[in-house]
């Protein structure tokens, strides 16, 4: 039997949302076990997953996302390698996440733009038209002074897929 849990969305404090009474929401019945890493095109894996740990990438551990520490459990279970992309002047990159039928899959993406650079990342989550499962993507980003990061996400998943987008 697979254990399920509820994940809380929006740990970030925001007075407007607090006033409206919707500061937190629950995503129900998320499996605790059975998570895989989302397959990504080979060129991206070769280019961006073996980046050495430096102070900049280490600092991403302190960046909070909307799902907070709860998504960390899924990250550990999936054993997903972090995809780390940084800009040098102006850079554009495409990520295609291919989610498979019947799978729960996770991807961990970190984006960094040094001072006065521009980084654009197009991210497409896709599946077969009749597939089902859960696709979860956590994206953390950091932009230095004068830098810009543009994140364009396309959800091309089947209507039977549940998509968790943790930015």
Region locations from a protein language model:
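Long, low-complexity, mixed-charge
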Residues: 1-82, 90
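Conserved beta-strand/loop scaffold segments within soluble protein domains that form the structured core
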Residues: 64-167
């Amino acid at each position: 039997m697979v254990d399920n849990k509820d994940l809380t969305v929006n740990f970030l404090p925001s007075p407007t949302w607090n006033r409206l009474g919707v500061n937190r929401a629950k995503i129900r019945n998320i499996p605790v076990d059975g998570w895989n890493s989302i397959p990504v095109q080979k060129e991206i894996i070769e280019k961006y997953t073996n980046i050495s740990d430096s102070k900049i990438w280490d600092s991403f551990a302190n960046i909070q996302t909307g799902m907070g520490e709860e998504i960390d459990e899924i990250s550990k279970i999936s054993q997903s390698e972090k995809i780390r992309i940084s800009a040098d002047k102006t850079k554009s990159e495409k990520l295609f996440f291919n989610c498979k039928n019947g799978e729960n899959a996770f991807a961990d993406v970190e984006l960094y733009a040094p001072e006065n650079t521009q980084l654009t990342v197009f991210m497409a989550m896709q599946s077969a038209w009749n597939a089902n499962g859960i696709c979860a993507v956590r994206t953390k980003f950091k932009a230095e002074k004068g830098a810009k990061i543009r994140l364009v996400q396309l959800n091309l998943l089947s209507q039977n897929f549940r998509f968790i987008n943790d930015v």
